[in-house]
Every structure is written in structure tokens, then in C-alpha cells.
Amino acid sequence: MRGQAAAPGPIWILAPLLLLLLLLGRWARAASGADIGPGTEQCTTLVQGKFFGYFSAAAVFPANASRCSWTLRNPDPRRYTLYMKVAKAPAPCSGPGRVRTYQFDSFLESTRTYLGVESFDEVLRLCDPSAPLAFLQASKQFLQMQRQQPPQDGDLGPQGSGDDFSVEYLVVGNRNPSHAACQMLCRWLDACLAGSRSSHPCGIMQTPCACLGGEAGDTASSPLVPRGDVCLRDGVAGGPENCLTSLTQDRGGHGSAGGWKLWSLWGECTRDCGGGLQTRTRTCSPTLGVEGRGCEGVLEEGRLCNRKACGPTGRTSSRSQSLRSTDARRREEFGDELQQFGFPSPQTGDPAAEEWSPWSVCSSTCGEGWQTRTRFCVSSSYSTQCSGPLREQRLCNNSAVCPVHGAWDEWSPWSLCSSTCGRGFRDRTRTCRPPQFGGNPCEGPEKQTKFCNIALCPGRAVDGNWNEWSSWSTCSASCSQGRQQRTRECNGPSYGGAECQGHWVETRDCFLQQCPVDGKWQAWASWGSCSVTCGGGSQRRERVCSGPFFGGAACQGPQDEYRQCGAQRCPEPHEICDEDNFGAVVWKETPAGEVAAVRCPRNATGLILRRCELDEEGIAFWEPPTYIRCVSIDYRNIQMMTREHLAKAQRGLPGEGVSEVIQTLLEISQDGTSYSGDLLSTIDVLRNMTEIFRRAYYSPTPGDVQNFVQIISNLLAEENRDKWEEAQLMGPNAKELFRLVEDFVDVIGFRMKDLRDAYQVTDNLVLSIHKLPASGATDISFPMKGWRATGDWAKVPEDRVTVSKSVFSTGLAEADDSSVFVVGTVLYRNLGSFLALQRNTTVLNSKVISVTVKPPPRSLLTPLEIEFAHMYNGTTNQTCILWDETDGPSSSAPPQLGPWSWRGCRTVPLDALRTRCLCDRLSTFAILAQLSADATMDKVTVPSVTLIVGCGVSSLTLLMLVIIYVSVWRYIRSERSVILINFCLSIISSNALILIGQTQTRNKVVCTLVAAFLHFFFLSSFCWVLTEAWQSYMAVTGRLRSRLVRKRFLCLGWGLPALVVAISVGFTKAKGYSTMNYCWLSLEGGLLYAFVGPAAAVVLVNMVIGILVFNKLVSKDGITDKKLKERAGASLWSSCVVLPLLALTWMSAVLAVTDRRSALFQILFAVFDSLEGFVIVMVHCILRREVQDAVKCRVVDRQEEGNGDSGGSFQNGHAQLMTDFEKDVDLACRSVLNKDIAACRTATITGTFKRPSLPEEEKMKLAKGPPPTFNSLPANVSKLHLHGSPRYPGGPLPDFPNHSLTLKKDKAPKSSFIGDGDIFKKLDSELSRAQEKALDTSYVILPTATATLRPKPKEEPKYSINIDQMPQTRLIHLSMAPDASFPTRSPPAREPPGGAPPEVPPVQPPPPPPPPPPPQQPIPPPPSLEPAPPSLGDTGEPSAHPGPSSGAGTKNENVATLSVSSLERRKSRYAELDFEKIMHTRKRHQDMFQDLNRKLQHAAEKEKEVPGVDNKPEKQQTPNKRAWESLRKPHGTPAWVKKELEPLPPSPLELRSVEWEKAGATIPLVGQDIIDLQTEV
């Protein structure tokens, strides 16, 4: 039994030792040849073909290097698994770089991409010292640890203690792993699980080995039998954790409750050479609860050591010691074996054996224990071997009770993985049995955690991401400028993720030091000024040596040199240009033939040049200065920026910021150029841009192309004409423009991707680029079908180009299939006028067209067809010319053509306005024409004869109409006439602006103003037609109020068009007002609707109003007044005729202005415009009755003025203050009264004052009352005329001795004159008889105001007449009896509204007069009485008392020349007057006069309180009194009027005057009110 137990010992020892030595040998070889990987740096390590190894971080990742890596390659991921053990540093990481660990499948060197990357940073946690050991398991092709770059470049600094860690790696086969590899892997697993917890799970997920207590178990004897890759425990399959028994035992003997303790360390080798033996032991801990139960297995094991041979002289003596074993069975269990084999007991008599050692101390201080003793066998070469055991054991009893320590129960099964896919966690737990009898508690973890990785997550796309950049490489140049590079790797995408975006390499400039530079001469400077200006001298120039630098050699040669100068003769005084101050610059004296130069202004760089020349007589004179070398600061900056970008493009650097430069140049060029040098600078910038576009590092964008073309268009603007002419004088600079455009077409056609067709339309050129294959080419026409130009001038192109498809044939079949052609066509709008070919006899008579084909064809089998439209009228000998710089001067060609040539083109005239050119070369083409000897160059923009005739005829007819209306204005003044005058003015202004706009197309400011005003006057003409219709409608409906309506008419006629134009200009900022071809609204952008919309609205509203007026005219209850109906019909007919004709006129005007070349539109406009003028004159002048009557009256007035019949002969100059109406009627009536009063019939005078209509209430009153007996006459017919009339039937009135007028003063505000004498009784009776007789000669002269005679209350007892308030122009004819003998002093009568005959109530005979009042002291009459207020017709006549001061006897009128027929003629003017218009509204003026009355009452009360009224002077005239009020002379109180202070009872027949008829009232009548009198309905 002892031999059997000892036999397996050498096998168990030698096999692992041999495998371990083999691994150590491979490890040593790997360490010597570690740097065999593909890395490009020394700190890159690739390990492959090795199964075990070790390295430290200090060796693999040195402190002075970054981006170092260590890579372990798996021989075959399907057969092997990589394991790694990392011993972390005790301190946290402190170095600048972080070490990352990950596995990957492969690495693509071309894109620096890692495929299948999986990081282990979460598993290892190298910078976390809380877990000293970390383990991981990798199953992919490569396992790599890489040190990342620190955040900033520079010195990495010393490596901290926390950055030093050590790594062991192991490659284990998945099937049949070696025993030694399993031993090491099981120990790693034991340590991994022992140190695992929730925050640090174990990184070893599974092993192919059967692990048991940290060792590789024997599959034959172990109860844990591995089958394949699983271990069985109690017949249940599990993972590698089932192969472990105890993970908490330590070498100190504190472990589980029973079983073997851990092995001790290996002892010293028994021999120094020749092969020795090392041993180690372990102790057995008895199982709890099983008394006397031992452990199975050996207590001690050994291994060979120091097997190297000993020296020849060395004698070795050895102590042999065999492996011993013990049996854990009890003594009773041995039975007969003790007798058969013998129980270990002391042996004596063996000479070779030493004595037994003393028994050891009992192994247990409590309970049953063991004691051992040993002995050694000392043998020699001549002695025999020892017999018997060398070690003995015996039981020792102890009566003390042993403490029972806490014991762990079995581990629970591992939990499920925390994640269904990807990396997760698993854990298991165990419980501790509590200790007894003072035993120790359980030691070790209660829970273990490890990683689990069931399967990769499907369908979750992982995008690729870049790793950090590597450090910059060393500079490529040891001095001066060099380059550095750095790279980065991409962690490739997974499951369809996106690739890494960006570059994996970066380059930067580096500079280590300056290289030595030898000195180098710069170019010679320009020669200095000559020492003398003439007669021979010298001039000097010098050069500068640049360098040397950084130790280079100096320049060789002279620094300056001299030459002779000034050999010409000195000029005479007349050959020298004097000093001149021109253009704010002082030009010094300069000889003829030389050029003076001064600096450009502050906003530019360069020089201003001015040449001094000799005239034909040999006298020196200054030529105009040229600014060809002056370049503005902005253009100079753009030019320098472009040159910098070109330099970068030539070095192969990518172009950044080129688009911004083009955009900046576009913005600057839109503001115009200041100097001719700006043009050349811009061309230079565009040429450099073309070279940049040609480079492969920059591809032009569509925005760049558009900006490029727009810049060229800005250069060709009309504002730059003078600068182009100046540039042409210095040289043929136009050829640079042609070359620039040709190169641009070439570059764009072949550099832009996906370019098919491109059209660029600007204000001054059109660019068309076509890219097409040669195999499928067709004829190209310019413009192509479906042309949609945005510019007005190019919308209807007048010039055409046809390129035959035969041009694109190369003649080679192979080349035709792959050839691509680019065709560029450029139409220059006004370049021809810039090319300095205008002479006295020749001119470029077309636009300029350029045709380019790239690559250029060998020849043109079919010539180009180009059709040109002529630009000038009156030209002959149209000749096709082309731009050809290679064509030399020809004797047959005109010398002034310059680079233009007529060779290669054939001219085919089409018509008077078009010419076709057939050319066999590709170039730039135009038409050269000969001016007629008697013709001047007539630009199409000059107004044509048709427009001039149409506008002139219309304007003249309308102007004649205005003159007629002005001449008879006082007869026809009305709203309708005002509207017509404004309407005519708007049409006349529109015609003038049309002609002006045709000549100002080149002046942008004037053209914009013309377009805006033309827009305004066109709309105003429509609005005035609408105003006329509105006025007619208001008159028909009876809502016409003169002052208010006239203001609205003006707002509609002028205000509405002004508002529309102001809004349009404000919103568009005047863009669209005027174009390059005409001064009118642009057809683009919708601005034209600002005219069409309002005009259409006016037409629609006018139609609606016309329908309403027509409905009113034809209805039964419509207009009753015949004359008003006739006028309404005339106005409606005028609108129906004029409005359509006006719309047609302006439509044809817009077409004629926008399309100048269409003769049809111009003829239509001329016809419509002329017809419009005639129709307006016909409708509003010839066929209008009012105008006819007004003209007749005007002629009669002229005749009467020639005969002396004027109103200027009135008394006291009153005619100068009266209106025309008052003059005529007053003169007529006074003539009739003075000549024969019977001849003045009622029909003659009342017809003049007849109103066309009365309010309904007044009509009812008149219908109910008795027939009227009062008739109206003008208010200014003086009573003096009746007083002295020889045919007045009354005759002189007798004087009544008993009549008197009593001045009553009572509480009333004003005094009243009371008539109570016989004269007033006589007046009452005569008044009654006059009503009964109703003779034709009875009449009443009333003021033109609308006074009303109303019936008085019956209870009033007296007839009170207020003499003070009696209007001075009121006269009542009482009787025609021949026996009447009282004077013509009449009481006032009241007038019904509107001057109609009043309704007179019956007059009752007055009661007997009351007894006379007591006598009083007579009060002297005041020096003057307040004059009566002048009514509308009362112009202020003198007092009714004739006297020397009245002027009645001093001035006589000759009225015999005025007949009744003259009055009949004059009455027609005023037949339609409505005197109700004087006040507009009765209510308004009643309120106004009530206010005035209150003021007068207040003034009267103050006057009554102040004593000495008789001595007070007359009050000063108030400001609101009219001028004619000052002409009223004061009059005294009549002699037959008595003043009484006591109050008298009112008379029942008292006639009360209206408030505004009182003496103190003042009618606020202004000039506008007087005009309202003349208003027509």
C-alpha cells in the first residue's frame, strides 16, 4: 500500500515541471523576439506563436513615447482562447496617457480601420487599485493594449507609480488543453472568483479545464468528472465553477471545516548540483462531526531541482528522503492490516537509521489530535539501505472541547445573465453556518460575480468611431519649412453601422530652424530722374541685396549704376504746358511729349497720368487726365486676396474662401467703379478666378458661376461707359474681356459636375452654356426653345444664333462616341457702344455676340448663322464683322476697324431692320453700318414721330379745352368743370412724361422719376373719370354739398393715385420703376399690377355707378327736374364714351413704351390718344349747352364793355364788391326801374331766382297758402331808385303830422322802433289793398338770403316794426294809387326759404292806439346807428335817407343802353342757382347766429349800463367784418322818430326779423361760399 501510494508521486511532479519549463523556454524566446510585428514604431509589439508570456508596463509602454501598443495574436480563434492576468499598480494612474485594452478581428491598413472591435476597459479597470488583480478572456483574432496620446502634445513627463502594472497571458486550447495550462488557468480562475464582487466581476467566463481547488483535477479519481468542456458535480453538468472545491483556503491553515489545507512553499533543494529535490507539505483538517476522519492523499510532494552536473573534484553526500503518505482511516478500520504490514512503531537495531525524534506536540489543543515523530537514514556508499518508516503518527487525546468555527454552505447555482445579449453579469451566493464554542466566523465572500457573454446583440447597428490621434511625426525637413503627419484608427462599424467619417491622416507645416540663405540681388529699381531736363545729364538706379540670412554668403557685384540722359534739346517756352489746377490736383510744368503723374486720391492707389502735347500750331496743351492706373482700395484688396488663393491653388492646396471672395467682389461692383483702373483690376481678378477654377482642388459651384457672370454684367453697366472709353484709349482692353469669357466657358463646361445646360441672364449680357456629346448632337439655336429670361430686354430676343451639328463631328468613330463638346454663346447688350468704333461715318449697328466651342473644331463645314437687329435708324451698307486679332492690316479693310475684320463672314440683308451673317469661324460678331450723309444717328430710344404726333395732338386739343374753360370760368364754374380741368391736366402730363421717358432711359434717376410720375398720372386720369361719375350720382340722389364734396373729389382724383404710388415705391424701394429699355413699370416682379389693379377697379366701380344713374334716369319716381335730368344724362354719356377710350389709350401706351420696335402699338397709341382728345373736347365743350351759353355771354360782355356798359358806374364803387351775378341782375333791374317799371315783368326777373326744387315741407306750405303776391328781386336795388322814379304810381307821399316812431327800451337786449302814427296805419291799409289787387307791377325786393315770413301769433296786440334792424335793401311796394302822397319808406317784409314767394296771412285792422305816454325830455339822436348786416346780395348800400352824403345826386347812371333783351340773355347763366347753398344747412347757421346774437345782447347790456352813450365814438370794426361793411356810412335817426324809455306792449302785427338779419350780426361769408353760389346741380 505504501508503494502504491508513492508511485504516482514522480509522475505528478515531472509532468507539470516539464510543461512549465517548455512554456518558460518559449516565453524567453518571445521576449527576445517580441518586436516582430508590423508596427512602424519601436514601441509597437506584436506577439504571435506563443502560448504563455509576461511583460511589465514600464518595458512595453515607456514614459517618453506615446501611441505604444502591445498585440497578442490568436493562432486560430476557433481552436484557442486568450486569457490575461493583470496585476495592477497599488496607486491610481497618474501618467498623461491612458492604456486601453480591446480585441478585434482584423485591421485594414488602407483605411486604418479596426473590424469587430470590443473594448475590455470596463473589465480590467487598470486605474482602479481597489481590485489588485484583473482577468479577462478574449476569443477574437487579436488582443491589444494601447497607450493613448496625452491631451496635449509635448513632453510626456515622468511615469507615475500608478502606471506600472504587469501582465501575464495564456493561450489555451479549447479541446484537450495541456495539464500545465489547466493548472495555471485554474489558479487564475480561483483568484478571479475569489476577488470578484458586484463592482468588479470576474473576467473569466468559462474554461476548457476541469478545475478542483485551484488545481487541475484527475479525471479518473476526481468526483468532478469533466466531459468535454463541462464539469459534472453530482451528475449535473455545469461550468468551470463546478470544478472548484474551495476558493477560500489559505496557507495559514484557516480554511473549510474539513479537508486538506493549502500546500506550503517549496523548501530548499537538497543538493546544489547533480540533481536535488524540493518538497512541500500540507496539513489535513478533520471533518466536523466525523471523529477520527482523516484526509486522503499525500501530505508531502517533491520535485527535481539543481540538475546541473557537479564538478570533477566535488564529492557529494546526500540525504535521501522519500515521499511519505498518511491514511486518514481510524485505527479500528485497519484490522488485520496492522498485523500484516505492521503498525508504525519504533525500530531498533537498524545500524543505518538514526534515532527517532521526540513526539511532536499534539496537533489539536482540544479533542482528538495527532502526534508525529521522524528519523533520518544516514547511508554511505558502502552501507546498506535503511529499512522501516521514517515517520510515525499516533493519536493524542485531549479532554478540552474544541470550538466549532463558522462554516460555509454550498454555493448556490449561478444566476441567469443580466443581459440577453452582449456583455452581462452572473452571480452566486452562499450562507454561513454560525460558529460554536467560541469558534471563528466564516471568512471569504458571501457573493461572487463574473461577466457573461451569451451572444452578440442582433440588429443593433454600431457606427464606427475614431480613436484618438497619434502624435505628430518628425518634421520632413531639417530646416526651413517641412511637413508633419499624424494618424488615427477607426473602430469599424458593426451590424450595418455607418463608416467613420473624415480623414485618418492629418498634415501640418513644421519649422525647425532657418536654412542658411545666401544674399541675392533684387531687381533693379527704376531709373531716377535725370539730373537735367534737357541738354545732357545722367540718371542713377540702384538695387538692393536681399540677405544674407542665417550665415549665408553676401551678394556679389555693384549696388548702383549710371547712364546718360536728357540728350534732347531744351523745349521752347511755348512748348511747355504751364502749371494747371485741374481736378483738385496741381499739375506742374511739363514739356510737350511727356507725361505728368500725381498720386491718386485717398480712396485709391496708383498714379493719375496726364500728357502734355502740341497742337497743330505747335503750342503745348494739357490732355485730359487718365485714371487707368488708379485702383480703389476695395478693388486692390480683392485683387491681393485672389492672388493669394491662386498661389495656394498652384501649390496644390485646397481652395477655401474662394466663394466669399467672389461674393465680396460682386457686392463692390454693384456699387459701381470709381476709376477706369477698377475695370482692369476686376478683369485681373476674374482671370485669376478662372485659373483657380481650372485646378483640380476646387470645383466651382452654381453660385460661383452666377456671381461671375453678374460681375461681368456690372462692368458693362451704362455708368461705366466713360471708363471703358478711357481704357480703350490705353489699349485694346476689350480683347481681355473676350478671352476671359471664353476661358470661363471652357472651365465651367468641363469642371462643373452634372452640367448639362446653363443660362445666366443679367442686365447687360446673356450667357448660354451647353454640354453635349458629339454622337447625339443636334443643331443648337440661341435662344433655345422654352426660353424663360428674367430680364426685360432679353425676354423677347431680337438676335439669333444657329450652330449646326456638323461642327461637333471629329471624323473619328471612336472619338465621336466619347467626345464631349461645350458650346458657349454670349450676347452683350451694350458692349458695342464701348468699343470705340463710333466714327463720323461708321457705327456698330447691333449687339455683340460671341460663340465659343470647346474643344475647337478643325473647320466649320456649315457656317454659323447669326441674325442681328439694327440699333440705329438711317444707316446703310450693313457689314458683318468679327473679332480677329491675328488678321493683319488689309488695304481693302477700313483702317479704323482695328482688331475687327470683315473676312470670314458673308452679309445677307433680311429687311430694313435685320441682317443675317454667315461666318466660317468661331469668334465675336457684330454689324458695322455706314451713316447716311444727311442722317443723324437716331437711337431707337428717341421718341418716334408716331408718338410725338399722338401725344402732341392730344395735348393740344386738351390744352385748348382748358383755355376755353378758363376764359368763361365765372359762367361755368362748378364741380363738374373742376373735375374736367383736373382730368385734362392729368392726360397732358402723361403725354409729356411719355415723350420725356423715351429720351431718358440711360439716366437711371430721371427715368425712375418719370416712371413713378407716369404711374401717378395714369391712375389719376382713371380716378378723375370715376370722380365725374360720382359727382353725377351725388347730384342725382340730392346729396351734393359743395365744400365737403369738393374736398372728397380732390382726395379721390389726386390723393388715391398718390397713395398707390407711395405704397408701391415704399414696398419695392423704387426697384421696378424704370428698366434699361423704357421708363415705365417693370414687367417682372408683379409691380405692373399696381397699375392694372387700381385701373380695373376704377372701371368696375364706374360701371356700377353708371348703372345706378341710368336706373335713376329711367325710373318713374326719379329725377323730376328736366334740366338736372339732362345734365345727369350728359354726364353718364360722357363717362360711357371717355372711359373705354381712356383704357384703350393707356393700354396701347404701355405696349408702345415697352416694345419700342413695334410700329403697330405706336400707331394704335397715336390714334387712340388723338381720338381721346377730340372726344373730350366734343363732349365737354362743343356739345355742352352751358359752355355754349357761357361763350355767348362772354362775347356779349366783351361787346358791352366796349360800349361802356359796365358795373363800375355804381354808386360809391359798390360794383367792385359785388359778384358777377349781382352786377348783372342789379344793373338790369335798376335800368328797368329807372326807365319803365311796368316793363319789368314778373316772368323776367323771377325766372332768374327760381329754384329747381324745394324741400317737401316747403312745397306743402306753398300749396296750402294763398297765391303769392311777393316776387324776388336782387337785394341791392336801392330804394332811392323808387323814390325818384318818375313812373312810380304812388307819387310823392303826403306828410302825416300825427305819425311818430317811438324808441322803446325795455328788458329786451335791443331797442325797437314802434310805429304808431298815421303813416303806419296807412301802410297797413295799403298793404291789404296791394294783396287784393295783385298787380303785375307789384314786387318785393328782398335780400338773397333765405329769410322767412312766418305768421305771427294771434295774441300779439300790436304791429311792431324794428327800424334799427330793418335791412337797408328791403322794399315793399304797397300801392299803385295815383293819390298816394307818402314817401317811399317801407316797413320790412320777410322772405320765404330760397327766395320763393311767401305765404302772407291776412292782416287784421289794428286796434285803437293806446293813450300817448307822458312827455319826456327829448333825447338827442345818436351820431350813428349800427349798420344793418350785409346779406349775400347786400353789398352795403348807403342809408335810406337821401342827403348830400349819400352820393345819390352826385353820380348819375346812364342805363338807357341796357335793354330787356340783355336781361333775358343774362338770366340764362343763373337759371340753376340754388340760394339754399349759401348756408349749406339751416340748422348750422341758426346755431352760429344764435351765438352771435348772445354776444350782441351781452354787448348791448354793457352799453346800456355805461352813461353818456351819445358821446361815445363809433365802435371799431371787428376782424370778421367784410371789407364792404366799412363802406357803410352812418346815418342818423329820422326826425319823425320819438324815443321813449318806458316799455310798450307788443303789437300783434309785429314782424320779427331772423337772427342773422339783425344789425349786429355778421355773416361769415368767405370766398369759398361765394364760389358755392355758382355751383351747378
From Swiss-Prot:
**Which BP terms in the Gene Ontology apply to this protein?**
adenylate cyclase-activating G protein-coupled receptor signaling pathway; apoptotic cell clearance; cell surface receptor signaling pathway; defense response to Gram-negative bacterium; engulfment of apoptotic cell; innate immune response; muscle organ development; negative regulation of angiogenesis
Annotated transmembrane regions: 945-965, 977-997, 1005-1025, 1049-1069, 1090-1110, 1133-1153, 1163-1183
Query: For the modification Phosphoserine, which residues carry it?
Result: 1462
- GO molecular-function terms, A-Z: G protein-coupled receptor activity; lipopolysaccharide binding; PDZ domain binding; phosphatidylserine binding; transmembrane signaling receptor activity
TSP type-1 domain mapped to chain residues: 257-311, 350-403, 405-458, 463-516, 518-571
Extent of Low complexity compositional bias? 313-325
Q: Does the keyword GTP-binding apply?
A: no
The stretches that face the Extracellular side, renumbered to this chain, are 34-944, 998-1004, 1070-1089, 1154-1162
Q: Name one GO cellular component term.
A: extracellular space
Q: Where is the GAIN-B domain?
A: 756-935
Q: Where is the segment annotated N-terminal stalk following vasculostatin-120 cleavage which is not required for signaling activity?
A: 927-943
Which ranges of this chain reside in the Cytoplasmic compartment per its record?
A: 966-976, 1026-1048, 1111-1132, 1184-1577
Q: What PTM annotation applies here?
A: Proteolytically cleaved to produce vasculostatin-40 and vasculostatin-120. Vasculostatin-40 is the major form and is produced through proteolytic cleavage by MMP14 between residues 317 and 325 with cleavage likely to be between Ser-322 and Leu-323.
- The protein's predominant localisation is membrane
List residue numbers at the site (Cleavage). Answer: 922-923
List the PANTHER family hit by this protein, alphabetically.
ADHESION G PROTEIN-COUPLED RECEPTOR B1, ADHESION G-PROTEIN COUPLED RECEPTOR
> Subunit details for this protein?
Interacts with ELMO1 and DOCK1. When bound to ELMO1 and DOCK1, acts as a module to promote apoptotic cell engulfment. Interacts with MDM2; the interaction results in inhibition of MDM2-mediated ubiquitination and degradation of DLG4/PSD95. Interacts with PARD3 and TIAM1; the interaction is required for correct dendritic localization of PARD3 and TIAM1 and for dendritic spine formation. Interacts with MAGI1, MAGI3 and BAIAP2. Interacts with PHYHIP. Interacts with DLG4 (via PDZ domain). Vasculostatin-120: Interacts with CD36. Vasculostatin-120: Interacts with ARRB2.
Task: Copy the domain comment.
Answer: The TSP type-1 repeats in the extracellular domain mediate binding to phosphatidylserine. They are also required for bacterial recognition and binding to bacterial outer membrane lipopolysaccharide.
Please give the name of this protein.
Adhesion G protein-coupled receptor B1
Annotated source species: Rattus norvegicus (Rat)
Gene giving rise to this polypeptide: Adgrb1
